[in-house]
Amino acid sequence: IKYFCSSPEKFKVNKKFDVILNMEIVEHVEDIQFFLKCCSKLLKKNGIMFIATINKTLKSYVFAIIGAEYVLRWLPIGTHEWEKFVKPEDLKNILKSNNLFLNKLDGMHFNLIKDEWNISKDTSVNYIAEFLKN
């Protein structure tokens, strides 16, 4: 297994990959459509792209920005911009235009008492999506 940590816009290689992981990234990029287009070009046919990100809801604003940045101080203030959060449906549409189709969508929930993340059906704050390239 080879891992590459690079921006897809700057990644210059004549290879395509079986799997691309975009974990907690897309809510920070300047141009999500261009970023995902570049990622899709790096993915082989029948490849899988995983995207973990934050939904664009009032609840996500309260939990991911007010809670995580201001109250719990898990992250520096200003780490997230709510305007860059992305709804699953919007992500699905962007990737559909790049020949990737949603295969699975799950919510992710942090349990403060157990100090652990769990998969859930609630996608209103954090979620992870699996897309397949056609």
Which residues fall in each region the model found?
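General small-molecule cofactor/ligand-binding pocket signal
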Residues: 2-4, 103-106
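Short alpha-helix
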Residues: 82-105
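Short, solvent-exposed polar/charged micro-motifs at secondary-structure junctions
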Residues: 13-15, 113-117
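Conserved SAM-binding loop
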Residues: 1-61, 88-91, 129-133
